[in-house]
Each structure stands twice: as C-alpha cells, then as structure tokens.
C-alpha cells in the first residue's frame, strides 16, 4: 500500500486517466474529487461492502431456487 500526504488543492494521479484531488480538509473529514473514465466504478467502501453482501445473498438464493427447480423437474420427469 502506498501512503501519501496531500494538502488542500493538491492531487494524485493514478495511471494517466485517474486523478484524485483534495478539495477541503476539515477537523474530522477530507473532501475529495475523483476524475476517472465512466467505465471505472467508484464506490465508498461501506457501499461496496453492502453490495458484496447482497450479491452473496442473491447467489445463495439462486442456488436454492436452482435446487428447487431441479427437484420439480425430476418429479415431473419420473
């Protein structure tokens, strides 16, 4: 992990197409701006974690549904 220090109105470049700018620094928060191509997904980590958990639940539900469908299929094809 790379750790950098930046002041307000300074920025960081990632590759040639992503720029992270420090807009404002307050007592307990930092406001940043991120310029990136539209195909790059940018999410707050807590939102990403929620999405990841919901996807896991969905996959488990899909597995259960597939099992139920298979059982129905087997039942009607006896």
UniProtKB/Swiss-Prot annotation:
Q: Which GO terms describe its molecular function?
A: mRNA 5'-UTR binding
Listed name of the protein: Translational regulator CsrA
Q: InterPro entries, from UniProt?
A: CsrA, CsrA_sf
Q: Which PANTHER family match?
A: CARBON STORAGE REGULATOR
Q: NCBIfam families from the xrefs?
A: csrA, PRK01712.1
The organism is Borrelia hermsii (strain HS1 / DAH)
Taken from the record, one Pfam family name reads CsrA
| One CC-aspect GO term | cytosol
- Family recorded in the similarity comment: Belongs to the CsrA/RsmA family.
């Amino acid at each position: 992990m790379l750790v950098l220090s930046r002041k307000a109105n300074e920025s960081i470049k990632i590759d040639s197409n992503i720029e992270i700018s420090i807009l404002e620094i307050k007592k307990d928060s930092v406001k940043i701006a991120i310029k990136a191509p539209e195909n790059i997904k940018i999410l707050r980590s807590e939102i990403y974690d929620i999405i990841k958990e919901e996807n896991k639940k969905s996959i488990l539900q899909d597995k259960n549904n597939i099992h139920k469908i298979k059982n129905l299929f087997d039942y009607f094809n006896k």
